[in-house]
């Protein structure tokens, strides 16, 4: 079972500051949607590793989903399909939620309006950093 390591307020603030820097670069037009997703994915992988104590930064999305307890389908592939169809994470388990966000961000974003998709990605990342 994956741990849930408490995080000091100062450390959580540092993760929030990193997220703020990414958000500023997005707002300034320095990142396209793909670059934003890659930066947010790296940030959330590091955050999830700090919270879980598990090697998340190098794990695949499938490995992350496999190690996270879930209230949803037990099959990783079924979870990926459900999340991609919904276009958003469905799991209430924090690590599962991160894994599902990564799965959504892996998908090509040609069918989404980039500005709205970017703001949605930032909102989801902010929720993880402030609530987990």
Predicted regions and their residues:
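Membrane-proximal, non-transmembrane interaction modules
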Residues: 24-132
